Amino acid sequence: MFGFGRLSAEGKVGIASGVVFFSMLISRTLISERVDKGTRALLFRVQFLLFINSLLLLGSLYLWKRVVKRLCGARAAPSVPQRCWRIIVLLFLALVHGSYLCMFFLVDTEPHWLSLLSFSCLGVYVILLFFLFVFGCLNRLGKLLSRSRSAEEAVASGSFRQTVLALIITAVLAVYGLVNAAQPPKVVDVEIPVEKLPESLNGLRLVLLSDIHLGPTVGRSKLQRIVSMVNELNPDVVVIVGDLTDSQVSRLRSAAEPLGQMKPRLGSYFATGNHDYYTADVEGWFELLHSMGIEALHNSHAKVFRPERTEDWICLAGIDDLEARMLRYPGHGMDVEKALNGCTTEGPIILLAHQPHAAKQALQQRPDISLVLSGHTHAGQLFPLTILAFLMNPFFCGLYRVSEHTMVYVTPGTGYYGIPMRIASRSEITNIVLKQA
């Protein structure tokens, strides 16, 4: 008979992760609609914390073997430097596992130092695990190819050097990533040709923001800097394409206040992202944004026009995030037809769709859409997550021509999620100028 106790530590953690994951699926399908919003949010957070820490534990066990056991050996009485190294690694892993606790319990107007430290450690953890895994695979390949004892010994000594090299590369990349993420977003000027654009709206300036992620590591001061940069561009329209926040209004009301200082001539608009739904407080954010003069496009659209030419307008539509329906968030779910109901095909249609997958689905339903603005990918945010983001999304970053009449622009995001690092990506404020095609 199968014995759970005979499994390795990694096997036990893997099974525990699977159990938690399936409990999340069951609760979403059978329980979520039978409990109130607050209880549902609490249940999701507890399950998410258990699941993410189970996955982190798998990586931590591997990391401990590589950077402690391999570097320090298996001596019964470790030396003082070896003891210090073990303590440092233990503290590091404790901070890594505590990072998502900070997301739920240490959110305020400005980031708490412990949140910044924990999520920085998480970034180091991700980078280090990647290089340890790659070097480990190379080492195993070397063992398979080696035929002599001397060759095997050379591979073993090379494994030690590879671990040290992984630590050095990680340190360099982490410092670069922290410095890069701390810089102001880069203003990127993009000129996009739009068919059927009226003459009166030729040259319309639209500023695109996305993935600000107000929360444990992004606070009021960073948002204030973003808003100041937006106002310097003197835009006609500002759009925020999802993932504005990672927590409830009650915790971030003060941090979000700078949003009310944006003064575009023709209005500010918002469409939801998946993280906005994770807060379980979308209606609260809709109300706060409305009080600041920002219109939430909840499967709806607005007419954008210049006051002197009201008959010439753009249909600016926004759809709920793809995950709203999966999360069974009451009254929410992506509905392209509802969002575009009332838009005329004689004029241009611009759609705000947070996820590139949503952009693809929307264009399959309505190929008459002129331009889709998306975010979500962060352009990977930091290597090696760049690889996953590229492989998992139909549009990764930048401007894409989908057809003769349709284009998609994916911003790498204006902020960052959790980990205050950007490697092989940048924070961006996109200054779009619409031109007649």
From Swiss-Prot:
It is found in: Membrane. Pfam families: Metallophos (PF00149). Keywords: Hydrolase, Membrane, Metal-binding, Transmembrane, Transmembrane helix. InterPro entries: Calcineurin-like_PHP_ApaH (IPR004843), Metallo-depent_PP-like (IPR029052), Metallophosphoesterase_sf (IPR051158). GO terms for molecular function: hydrolase activity; metal ion binding. Disulfide bonds: none annotated. Its cofactor is a divalent metal cation. A divalent metal cation 2 binds at D243, N274, H376. Binds 2 divalent metal cations. This is Transmembrane protein with metallophosphoesterase domain. It comes from Danio rerio. The lineage of its organism: Eukaryota, Metazoa, Chordata, Craniata, Vertebrata.
